[in-house]
Structures are given as structure tokens and as C-alpha cells.
């Protein structure tokens, strides 16, 4: 396993209103190119132990235009959640391949979760890497804590039934990423 970056940076918190929900049929096209803020319901805040076969925990993404995406709305589609940071060299190394996969597979939902950084630095990174997928702002580290993420990059692969199929801590090579995505398609 490649080394992962320590997740110890901090940033300000943010939350949003409850508004119109998104339908899974609208994804990933309508979900992309936004910077939703992560929110974890109080009843779901207990960290999980990452293991294959366990259910993915509940979380919500709140977009700046008021749209809300609940993690349960992702059922029916394969999902990759990638935890990363702009200051993390291994995250930079793997991002081009993740973006390539997001562009190549319209059925795959990729959520790029930035941990504890501000919007402007994240926006610059997203533009530099041509990130077409949603770049989730986990400014308080709620999703990081919920998924028990210890270092970055870490990728979680969730099947269409909402179960964690696998996860990887460290840089994913193109062949490793292909293999893990094959398991959830």
C-alpha cells in the first residue's frame, strides 16, 4: 500500500438549508461541477469500521443552490468516494486517473471529498485537474470521521445496493482502480 498523507489540517464549518432533493436519474450530469457541503445527521455520526459487505453510512450533500443529495439517493448506481486534500502529493498523483474514470463511465458516481480546506483553494485544484465530478467540501471533517479515514488519499467503493465493496488507503494505480471499479459495476 502506498503511503497516505496525514489528515490534520483544519478549516471553518458551514451548513445549508433543506431544499429540493435530487433524483438518481439526474446523476451524474446534474450533480457535477458543484461544491456541495457535507452534512452528517446527528443519529449517523458514530464512525463506522470500514469493511467489505457493511452498509455505507448516511450522509447528505448540500449544494449552494439549495439542492440536497442524500446518500440513500445514490442506490442503484456504483459509487466511488475519494478522500483527498490539495496539500497531499499522493492525492495529486492519483487524481488524473480518477478524473479519467469519472469521464469514461457515465453510470459511475464519483464523489471527490476534500477534507478540511476552504472553497477557493479547492476550486483552484478542481480547475487544475479538470474535475468534472462533485467536489464535496468536508470542512469540519464530518465525512472523514464518519468513514474513519485516517489518511489520504483513501477511496471507498460502494455497490449499487449501498454496500461497501472495498476500500483502499493510499495511491491507486490505474490497474488497481480499474479492478476495484469492476467489482462494483
Q: Which residues does each predicted region cover?
A:
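A short beta-strand-turn-helix
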Residues: 50-53, 58-79, 103
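Short pre-active-site segment immediately N-terminal to redox-active cysteine/selenocysteine motifs
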Residues: 77-79, 84-87, 151, 161
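N-terminal targeting signals for export/organelle localization
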Residues: 1-55, 180
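Structural microenvironment flanking redox-active thiols in thiol-disulfide oxidoreductases
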Residues: 92-129, 139-146
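Hydrophobic beta-strand core positions in alpha/beta domains
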Residues: 80-82, 112, 157
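Thiol/disulfide oxidoreductase modules built on the thioredoxin-like
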Residues: 124-132, 138-184
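Conserved redox-active cysteine motifs that mediate thiol-disulfide chemistry
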Residues: 75, 83-100
Amino acid at each position: 500500500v502506498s503511503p497516505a498523507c496525514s489528515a490534520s489540517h483544519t478549516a471553518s464549518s458551514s451548513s445549508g438549508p433543506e431544499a429540493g432533493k435530487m433524483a438518481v436519474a439526474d446523476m451524474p450530469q446534474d450533480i457535477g461541477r458543484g461544491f456541495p457541503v457535507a452534512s452528517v445527521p446527528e443519529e449517523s455520526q458514530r464512525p463506522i469500521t470500514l469493511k467489505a459487505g457493511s452498509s455505507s453510512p448516511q450522509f447528505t450533500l448540500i449544494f449552494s443552490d439549495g439542492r440536497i443529495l442524500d446518500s440513500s439517493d445514490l442506490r442503484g448506481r456504483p459509487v466511488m468516494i475519494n478522500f483527498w486534500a490539495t496539500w497531499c502529493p499522493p492525492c495529486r498523483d492519483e487524481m488524473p486517473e480518477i478524473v479519467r474514470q469519472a469521464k469514461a463511465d457515465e453510470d459511475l458516481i464519483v464523489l471527490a471529498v476534500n477534507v478540511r480546506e476552504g472553497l477557493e483553494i479547492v476550486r483552484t485544484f478542481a480547475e487544475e485537474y479538470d474535475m468534472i465530478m462533485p467536489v464535496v467540501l468536508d470542512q469540519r471533517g464530518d465525512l472523514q470521521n464518519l468513514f474513519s479515514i485516517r489518511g489520504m488519499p483513501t477511496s471507498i467503493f460502494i455497490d449499487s445496493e449501498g454496500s461497501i465493496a472495498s476500500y483502499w488507503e493510499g495511491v491507486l494505480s490505474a490497474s488497481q482502480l480499474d479492478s476495484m471499479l469492476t467489482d462494483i459495476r
